[in-house]
Amino acid sequence: EISECLVGSEMCIRDRNQIHFFGLDWIQSIGVKFIFKLDNISMILTALTSFVFLLASFASKFNIRTNHKFYYSMLMLLMSAILGIFTAGDMFVFFLFWELELIPAYFLIGGKWGVNENPMAQSSAIKFVLFTFLGSMVMLLGILLLHYYNFISNGILSAVFSDINSSSIPDYIQNLISICLLIGFGVKLPIIPLHTWLPDAHTNAPTPVSMILAGILLKTGAYGIYRFNYQTLEDAFITIAPILAVFALVNIIYTAFVAYAQTDIKRIVAYSSISNMGLVLLGLCAINQIGLSASVFHMVAHALVTCGLFMIAGIVYLRCKNRDINTLSGIAVVMPRLFGFAVVIVLASIGIPAFAPFISEILTMIGALNADFSDVLK
């Protein structure tokens, strides 16, 4: 059954030409169209988004006690922004939704929701917004350069992804654009050293928001790299991929050791998420079908496992008023059902065979080992 699922997912990803779209002209003078498209990868991620927000809404019942109308309106606005990112068919529409998500994310991370309010939550929210906004400005520069040079080189005044032909843009300009975009997406993924906002935001946010941050928000960075760098600026990405793969390995190894040194459950999961997103990035850097399939598969597997881990951390905190693993001995006696659930989720998170993360990690390694960087490294 697992092999059938893998073949099915690979065929789904391979067939990228089946795109359904709808939209309208927005700013005709510069070729911007308010257009939405669904290919197979964005379809997977939109379905994943809906499911994670469903889980977060369920968890909110136990973690949110005040300002319900405002909280759920921000939750739905954030969901709409993320779905807009995954379905945008135009670069500027993508950027519009990329910036729109900052507003609800700020209030959700830093808001006062009546249960176990964290005094550090607001400062964590500000840090998240500053990091993301500064990265977005660099990303916007890359989008503007891509839009301009696509017009200069091809005579096409359009910001629609399918109208961009980067092969006629000079190589050094492609590389510059690709780096600008990677900085913006690298904040959200995150790529070390642009990761310092994440542990604080994950730790200090309410449990449902932590589930969304790790389960979906990080995937917007990986999707941006796929949509812009991997798919649109393919030649530049082939050049940059070997260097980016080194950053991916640093993500995987360094943050795994940092996670090992933590005692707060949510902080452990936060650093573990950075390590797992390094695997996603490594799969993309392989630039082959196995790596791409593994990358998407691992995004889904990591989202589900991480939501489970944060849900466990939230339940433990609601019951024990504590997340320090050094003081939680004997919890299996007090909460045996939760303990059983936690054992399964933790085994999945560390990649035990037969669980989804194990399969995606093995496929990522196979994709990376089959990567051909010989032409680039000559």
Protein language model annotation of sequence segments:
Residues 1-8:
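Positively charged, low-complexity/disordered segments
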Residues 57-58, 82-84, 107, 224, ...:
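Alpha-helical transmembrane segments of multipass membrane proteins
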Residues 9-10, 46-61, 78-79, 102-112, ...:
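Central hydrophobic cores of alpha-helical transmembrane segments in multi-pass inner-membrane proteins
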Residues 38-49, 92-104, 174-185, 235-249, ...:
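Structural signature of hydrophobic alpha-helical transmembrane segments
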Residues 53-65, 107-120, 189-203, 252-270:
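C-terminal ends of transmembrane helices
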Residues 9-73, 153-162:
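Transmembrane helix-loop-helix hairpins at membrane boundaries of multipass inner-membrane proteins
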Residues 74-77, 81-169, 258-271, 275-325:
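Alpha-helical multi-pass transmembrane bundles of energy-transducing inner-membrane proteins
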Residues 15-33, 120-125, 136-195, 200, ...:
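Juxtamembrane/interfacial segments at transmembrane-helix boundaries in multi-pass membrane proteins
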